[in-house]
Amino acid sequence: GFNRIYKLFQSKSFFELEKRFSIMWMLDVSHCFDSIYTHSVSWALKNKAYIRKHVTNSNQFGQELDTLMQRSNNNETNGIPIGSEFSRIFAELIFQRIDNNIELDLMDEHGWKNKKDYVILRYVDDFIVFCNNESNAEIISKTINVKLNEFNLQLNKNKFKKYSRPFCTSKTGLIIKVNELIQNLESKLYEKHDGNIVLNKIRNKHDLKVYMINNIKSICLDSQASYSDVSSYLLSSLSKRL
């Protein structure tokens, strides 16, 4: 897997998927963490019928997680805290059940096999669908939404992003521009001679800082992006060069 979604778009596997499939849809779960119902972790680990049958048994793992999550969030059952590692693990338990349900439904209803007839990738609450025609993408997205609904979640249809080959997302374009800026910065900071790195003298550190900040602002403005869209890639790239 990838711990940052931008790493997917730079990976060998992404280009292999682009060779195999002509359609890519990006889908987003609406208000994901705010909408997660804490009891649904028990449904994910077992199923609703089992939980109802054993509702008085309070020492089940799912119920223990449910109770712990409620206590971390003022005893609320609707919504989980955003940002904590526990919340990410809690959500992942639910989403892995949803992933499995989607795959089973597409096989049972349409005879489609994952990684053969289509591929669904997921990064937290973002689904990326690869297939070979719009009608199949529509069926897959509807199936995803139905299976999300079973856990009181739903897709944000205002955030559907649809691409046909070649796949060039706004994120891809953003990363290309940031990478060019970093390479330009490198040329200002040092040069390579016979395999050795020679540091350049920075005559005005303030001017260099302003140059970087203004260029990042310009990239975000041109790409209609925010600092949060570029920060993780920028920090990762800079840390590798320090």
Task: List the predicted regions and their residue ranges.
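Conserved two-metal-ion catalytic palm core of "right-hand" nucleic acid polymerases
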Residues: 1-82
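Glycine- and acidic
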Residues: 22, 75-86, 124-130, 215-219
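Conserved pre-motif C helix in the palm subdomain of viral-like polymerases
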Residues: 30-33, 75-105
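Amphipathic alpha-helical scaffolding segments
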Residues: 39-51, 96-97, 143-148, 163
